[in-house]
From Swiss-Prot:
The gene is MFM1. Mitochondrial inner membrane magnesium transporter required for mitochondrial magnesium homeostasis. Modulates the conductance of the MRS2 channel. Involved in the splicing of mRNA group II introns in mitochondria by affecting mitochondrial magnesium concentrations, which are critical for group II intron splicing. This is Mitochondrial inner membrane magnesium transporter MFM1. It is a multi-pass membrane protein. The chain crosses the membrane at residues 329-349, 367-387. Coiled coil: none annotated. Present with 396 molecules/cell in log phase SD medium.
């Protein structure tokens, strides 16, 4: 039993009232069905607004995820592909007892607040429980139960879910039409194939969007490199890495399934219901089905890895360019420092010549010219020597670095 949170502080009453007005507009139907006069005690009107808001949000959250009621929202499809009703709530105990499941099998379905990155496919005595991206379903030889994936952003009332249900109905009906031929695969494999098609089409759409955005950013970086573009590229690289991880997990799941012959044989639910026993290697249909989508997922993984490699290569090139620019700025600063040092030699001679001391150098007619020439010569000599040494450092190559390391190793020995 989930406890309600405490009443929020009184100092935020005006903010809560504004939030309540927005909530009433969004969830007016939910608020109107709740009898506040019987459920809530009479308190301060401002505190009442905050309490009503919290009560409504908690009730809405419990309604979506079935907390406290022990039921799971789902859609039932019979052997002919017809839905028994648009929305059914099944008790957790009924799912476990009637369909031969274990209580831990429903953990992902009940607690799926977010997208499950790790897909799973469990084969039981007379059912297949699959959790693949946004689709969570229980497949039987004559029935399919599709669970609500509200936590992943796709609810039973969404257009994406309705399209998926329509595709599932069409495949399960298995009637030959002008657009679709009759499928010789058994009932459970047709349902499984529909789930794979839906999941992989979502992966493909997401991949196309990510690749298009990344390609545009990389092309823009060829003309100008700005901080905003680099920050945006970093965000896209994170999204690509997350997408690649998701695709790799789907591929790994298919790899594990293809390596387990006993599980592949157990997936023939229709044959098991009819009493037909499959031998260890008699699973050609399901193996070909899984290999087809394994190759498709592998192609998605390869494309995403190629895009990630392109982004990393671009980042390395940008780092090289930025390092080169930084080195040029450092060299410019060193040249200015060498110039100031060489100029200091001339100033030193001039300062000695200008001291208010008796040196009798002023009596010579060539003293000023001599000091000036010596100052210029010292300035040019110091600057040339510094620049020559700087050029030697710039011409240092990898081969010279290896030779230097070899000499140091020989000296140590």
């Amino acid at each position: 039993m989930r406890a309600f949170p405490r009443v929020l502080p009184f100092r935020h009453q005006r903010s809560y009232n504004n939030i309540l007005l927005r909530t009433v507009r969004l969830f007016g139907s939910s608020l109107s069905s709740f009898d506040f006069s019987r459920q809530m005690p009479k308190v301060d009107p401002d505190n009442t607004a905050a309490m009503l808001l919290q009560k409504n949000l908690i009730q809405r959250n419990n309604m979506l995820y079935g907390y406290g009621s022990g039921t799971i929202r789902c859609t039932l499809l019979d052997s002919t592909g017809r839905a028994k009703s648009p929305l059914v709530e099944i008790k957790r105990e009924d799912l476990v007892s009637k369909h031969g499941l274990l209580p831990r099998d429903l953990r992902k379905i009940e607690k799926s607040r977010k997208n499950d990155l790790v897909p799973s496919l469990l084969v039981r005595e007379n059912s297949i429980l699959i959790s693949l991206l946004t689709v969570k379903a229980l497949i039987k030889p004559d029935m399919v139960i599709i669970f609500d994936s509200a936590g992943s952003g796709i609810t039973l009332n969404s257009e994406a879910h309705k399209d998926f249900i329509n595709d599932m109905k069409l495949r399960l009906k298995n009637q030959e039409t002008s657009e679709l031929n009759s499928d010789p695969l058994p009932y459970e494999f047709r349902a499984l194939e529909t789930i794979f098609i839906s999941a992989l089409s979502n992966l493909t759409s997401e991949m196309k969007v990510l690749l298009t955005i990344c390609k545009g950013v990389l092309q823009d970086l060829e003309f100008s490199i700005t901080r905003d573009k680099l920050r945006f590229l970093l965000g896209q690289n994170k999204k690509l890495s997350s997408f690649n991880k998701k695709a790799v997990l789907v591929k790994d799941m298919l790899d594990d399934l293809l390596e387990q012959d006993d599980m592949l044989c157990d997936m023939y639910l229709t044959d098991k219901k009819a009493g037909k026993i499959r031998v260890q290697d008699d699973h050609t249909e399901i193996e070909m089905l899984l290999e087809t989508y394994h190759n498709y997922v592998d192609e998605i993984v390869q494309k995403s890895e190629s895009a990630i490699s392109d982004v990393k290569t671009t980042e390395e090139i940008i780092n090289i360019i930025l390092d080169s620019n930084r080195n040029e700025l450092m060299l410019l600063g060193i040249r200015y420092a060498i110039g100031m040092l060489s100029l200091g030699g001339a100033l030193f001679l001039g300062s000695i010549y200008g001291m208010n001391l008796e040196s009798f150098i002023e009596e010579s007619n060539y003293a000023y010219l001599t000091v000036t020439i010596l100052g210029l010569i010292s300035t040019v000599w110091l600057y040339a020597k510094g620049i020559r040494h700087l050029h030697k450092l710039q011409r240092m190559t990898l081969l010279s670095k290896i030779k230097t390391d070899s000499v140091h190793e020989l000296l140590k020995k």
